[in-house]
Amino acid sequence: MTDRTDADDLDLQRVGARLAARAQIRDIRLLRTQAAVHRAPKPAQGLTYDLEFEPAVDADPATISAFVVRISCHLRIQNQAADNDVKEGDTKDETQDVATADFEFAALFDYHLQEGEDDPTEEELTAYAATTGRFALYPYIREYVYDLTGRLALPPLTLEILSRPMPVSPGAQWPATRGTP
């Protein structure tokens, strides 16, 4: 679902930690959606999916105590296929798309700074959107995908649980870097 490494994700969590300790979610909205079924699924093959996230943050310097996290999502649902199902000249991507969906959720967060604290930086807000904000919106994204696939006359799709890497104990070495879902 993403190409960030565990180390990158942990670094973002650290940068956004001050905001994560003070922010509360106040409202969630589906801002836009577009979905299409491109071909019928092959029941004998089963389906697989790819979900990409693009987090962003909107913050108005005049409104110091609130910001909006937007998560744009691109979902591709494909037939599971063996390599021999791909015809010469075709790519797997061209032969497998059953449905696609593009949609965007937004969440309004507010926060309260302690006396004497600096306002959140753009880096903190962006890190928060990519970590805690994404985590906060994921259950809504997950439920929406389940509902959407049923409405498109596809088997309801239950997305995997969104996971975070485990923090490393002080003095311990980082495990081998790998991509995370």
UniProtKB/Swiss-Prot annotation:
Homotetramer, interacts with antitoxin HigA1. Chaperone component of an atypical, type II toxin-antitoxin chaperone (TAC) module, probably required for antitoxin HigA1 to neutralize its cognate toxin HigB1. It comes from Mycobacterium tuberculosis (strain CDC 1551 / Oshkosh). The lineage of its organism: Bacteria, Bacillati, Actinomycetota, Actinomycetes, Mycobacteriales. This is SecB-like chaperone MT2006. The keyword Chaperone applies. Belongs to the SecB-like family. SUPFAM superfamilies: SecB-like (SSF54611). Induction: Operon autorepressed by HigA1. It comes from the Bacteria. Keywords: Chaperone.
